[in-house]
Amino acid sequence: MDDHKRPLYLPFAGPAILEAPLINKGSAFTDEERVFFNLEGLLPHVIETIEEQASRAYDQYTNFTNDLDRHIYLRNIQDTNETLYYRLVQNHITEMMPIIYTPTVGMACERFSKNYRRNRGLFISYPHKDRIEDILNNSTRQKVKIIVVTDGERILGLGDQGIGGMGIPIGKLSLYTSCGGISPAYTLPITLDVGTDNPHLLEDPMYMGWRNQRIGGEEYKEFVEAFMQAVNRRWPDALIQFEDFAQKNAMPLLERYKDQYCCFNDDIQGTAAVTVGSLLAACKAAKSQLCEQRIAFLGAGSAGCGIAEAIVAQMVSEGIDEAQARSQVFMVDRWGLLQDNMPNLLNFQEKLAQKTQAVKDWTIENGNISLLDVMNNAKPTVLIGVSGAPGLFSEEIIKAMHQHCPRPIVFPLSNPTSRVEATPKDVLHWTNGQALVATGSPFEPVALNGETFEIAQCNNSYIFPGIGLGVLSAGAKRVSDEMLMASSRALAECSPLALNGEGPLLPPLEEIHQVSKHIAFAVAKVAVEQGHALPCTDELLAQSIENNFWTAEYRRYKRTSF
C-alpha cells in the first residue's frame, strides 16, 4: 500500500495536532477525525479538499505586491501545514521556484533575524560545542535522511550572513521535496553558528546569532569534526549536503569527509553536475562532443574549479587524454588567467593553471592575461561565469567571442540575479540571437528579431533532488564522482533541445518530477555498480524510487495510545 493511502496513527489530540506542521490538515480534517482528535470547534465548519485549500492560499499569495512578502507568506504556510505548502508549490512550481529559492531567498537571508517568526531546523552554536549530541536529539524530526548544513559564511553572492544563512538549507530542502519527492519528515536544515565577520550583523541589536567574530583554524576544524561524528552517530544513514561554505573551507571539508561519510558539496559538485549536464545537452544539439570545446571561466574559486574538473573528467571519458583536456580549459580570476608560474595558487587551482609556455606567444594588452585576451587568443567556444560580480561579460567580450564562434555557449551562472555577469537579453542582442544562454537565476524569455528565446535556468535544483532521491532509494553509503557524472548525463538525456533539435536547453520545471526520477535511477545504478549500495536489480531500483517518492496528499489519521 502507498504511504499516502496507509493510515497514520497519532498518540495525541487537540491543538497539538494543529501546531504540528507535518501532520496538520487545517480545514481538511474530516468529521470523523475532528471527533476522534478533539478538534470540534477548533476549526470552521466546512471541510475542504487540499485543492480547495491550495486555491485559497494561491489567491492570498497573489495579493502580495513584492517577492519578499510572498516568500514570507509561503514560509508561514510551510511552518503550519507542510503538505499544503508542497501542494501549492507543486501546482505553481515555475512561478514559485524563484520565490522559495533564488533569487528571493537571498533577501530572506539578509533579513532573517528581522523577519524571524518560528523555529525550523537546528542552530548549533560554537559555545555549545560540547552539547552537539544533545542538540541533535532535540530535533523534531526523528527519521532524518537528508541534512543540508551551512555555516553562513558565503551565502549566494552576498557573503557572510551569519545565522541568516539558515534560509539556504531551508530553501534547498524545500526543493528536495518539491522537485525530488523526498518526504519533508526526512529532512533537516542545520546552521553551524561559528560567529560572523559581518560588522552590520555584529552591530545589529536584532541579530539572533552568536555575537562574536568567526572562529577559524583548529577550533573550526574540531567543531565541524565533532558535528560530523555526532550526526553519524545519530543518523548513520543520512546524506549530508554542505552548502555555502567559504572557499577556504568548502574544498578542504569536502576532501576530508567525502570518503568517510555520505556527503557532497552542492556549490562545488552540484553546480558542476548541472553545468556539465547542460553543456552535454548543448553539444548534443550541435552534434558535437564536449571534448571538442574550448572553455573559458570567469571565476576560479571552488565552484568554478569544481565545474572545470568535472568538465575535464567528462572530456577524458569521451576519449582525449587528461593533459589535452586541461589545455582546453582557461580559468580567469581577478588576477587574470591562471598560469603555472603564479605564486599563491590554491591547491585546487594548480592542475587547472595553463602552462606559461603555452601562452607565451599570445598577444596581450597589459601584464596580466585578461578575459578579453583569452577571447582573442584561445578563441573559446564556451564561456562560464561564476565570479559573483555583475556585468563582467561586457559587450566587447561577448562580441569578441562571437567573432570566432558562430554559436557561442554563454553561461552567466552567478546568483542572485543582481550578481549575474550579463543578462540573457544583452548576450542575445550582442550575438544577434546566435548565443545559447543558460543562467543560474531565473530570467524572463527574450524577444528578438521576431523570435522568443526561452532562457534555461542552469540551476542545481535540476540535479541535487535527483541525487538525494537516488542515494535514499539505493541506500548508498557514499556519493562518488561517478554517481555525479551519471547525474549530468541523465540530465542531458532530458533536454528538449538535444532530443528534438528545438525548444529549451533544459526541460521545463513542470517536468521536474520525471527528471528527478530519471537522475535518481542513474545515480542509484552507479552506486550499486560501485559497491556503495547493496546489490539490486534495475527493476527493484526503479520500484524503490517510486516507493520513496513522496506526494503532497493528506493521509488518514487514526487514534492510538502512547
Swiss-Prot record:
Sequence positions that bind a divalent metal cation: 243-244, 267
SUPFAM superfamilies assigned to the protein according to its UniProt record, in alphabetical order: Aminoacid dehydrogenase-like, N-terminal domain, NAD(P)-binding Rossmann-fold domains
Lineage top rank: taxon: Bacteria
Required cofactor names: Mg(2+); Mn(2+)
Keywords in alphabetical order: Metal-binding, NAD, Oxidoreductase
Residues annotated for NAD(+) binding in this entry: 154, 267, 415
EC number per UniProt: 1.1.1.38
Cellular component GO terms, alphabetical: cytosol
Catalyzed reaction equations: (S)-malate + NAD(+) = pyruvate + CO2 + NADH; oxaloacetate + H(+) = pyruvate + CO2
Site feature (Important for activity) residues: 267
InterPro entries registered for this protein in UniProt: Aminoacid_DH-like_N_sf (IPR046346), Malic_enzyme_CS (IPR015884), Malic_N_dom (IPR012301), Malic_N_dom_sf (IPR037062), Malic_NAD-bd (IPR012302), Malic_OxRdtase (IPR001891), NAD(P)-bd_dom_sf (IPR036291), NAD_malic_enz_proteobac (IPR023667)
Keyword NAD carried by entry: yes
Keyword Oxidoreductase: yes
Pfam families referenced in this protein's UniProt entry, alphabetically: malic, Malic_M
Residues at the catalytic site: 101, 172
GO molecular function terms listed in the Swiss-Prot or TrEMBL record: malate dehydrogenase (decarboxylating) (NAD+) activity; metal ion binding; NAD binding; oxaloacetate decarboxylase activity
Cleavable signal peptide: none
Quaternary structure and interacting proteins, as annotated: Homotetramer.
UniProt similarity note: Belongs to the malic enzymes family.
Entry-linked HAMAP family: NAD_malic_enz (MF_01619)
Protein name: NAD-dependent malic enzyme
Species name: Shewanella woodyi (strain ATCC 51908 / MS32)
Gene assigned in the entry: maeA
